[in-house]
Amino acid sequence: MNNYAETELREGTLFSKKYNDYYSSKKDALSESTYVFLEKNNLIQRWLNLPENKDLFTIGEVGFGGGINFLNCCKKWLELDLKNKRLVYFATEKMPLKLDDMKILHGFYESLNAVSNQLLDTYPKLTEGFNLIELFNGKVQLCLIIDDAEIGFSQLIQSKQNSNTSYFESFDCWFLDGFSPNLNPSAWSSNLLEQVARLSSKHTTLSSFSAASKLQKTLAENGFNVSICKGFGGKRSMITASYKDNHNISPYVNPLGWHVEKYTPTRFKKKQNITIIGGGITGCLTAVALKKRGFNITILDQHGDVAIEASGNNRAVLYPRLSAHSSSLADLNMIALQFASNYYKKFWEEECGQQCGVLVLPKSNTEEKIFHNISLRYGRNENFFELLYNKTLKKIAGLNLSAECGLFFPTLGWLSIPKICKNLVKEFDIPIISSKADGLKFIASENSWEI
């Protein structure tokens, strides 16, 4: 990706050359973050009083910047040690900081070292669009959207349904923290704020350091009750807001297929027993994901062990399947590939394979053209993969090749699936029952299966 922010150090913090403004307050930025966003949204109290049937709290931020608000929330959330609850944090950033710049900025906040170190250690090669980062064993999930905020958040709007009937859980809280409206108007546009409203519900709150009259007016027009309060430090004022449940927003004009529109999410009770049939890589990863969310999990496998059949591959390549065409499936493949390269990093460190990179070669002239088009389409993501030619290609491969070009993915590699599966069930203490899944019976009255 080549749209990283141009920065320089000024007065003890990072300064944006493009927006001619500081990424954080020149003094006491952490206290400002706590005051403007945590305190004014009453987050600590809301987190402590989360209902038993609500397993996640979702924050949306416009303007991730150096991630100080995220780290501050992350630290406070972890200190509360809420069992089987997740903090899910969506943030947009059009021009992200380079990793080295992020390290410099975080270095000014020693109290955030523990959370900062984990973020920096798992910080992926960013790609345009959605970048999913899981921290602290799934207790915190960050979705960093590298795009204009209006474009990024619009992709979370499923259909004509509003957040109360859609299967997307509405945001609990919004942080509006882009560069000032005069310097970066797209981060405060009426179109963006309409999307913020569409992704909100009657329990949603919002805060911003800005108290601009246009911002107040636009929020009010989109269904928010807006209040002005004292700003942090020497700032005269800021705003807080809460969403009104009865506000009528215009229908969204990009509905999904009928089968998605009619979908109603199933609500599970916590501590429910779930049996995963099959102990392959998919079964093990699903079991772990559900275990992290507080369910009692058992794996049922006819061999009484994991990774015996198709997942018994000791040299499985994390293989990319990208497309030169723009589609939801192509975007999903890129997101999944980037997430997988980050997710398996831990296992590579445990010697369950090797992150040696993956080089994909074309099999025909047609595929060469496809590779070229893929490179053009994802041209901003050269840190994640690169189209190589001739001498460079030969140097990476370490041998002579007949192909004249190839797509190289430096963060991919090969994996020992049996080792990974065994490590997962051991780490998360997931029992395995040796049995075939005979006699499955659906109990309609209980919406469950009998094995």
What function would you assign to each model-found segment?
Residues 292-312:
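Glycine-rich FAD pyrophosphate-binding loop
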Residues 271-299:
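N-terminal Rossmann-like FAD-binding beta1-loop-alpha1 element of flavoenzymes
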Residues 315-396:
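Dinucleotide-binding Rossmann-like beta1-alpha1 core, especially the glycine-rich loop
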Residues 433-449:
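A conserved short coil-to-beta-strand element within the FAD-binding core of flavoproteins
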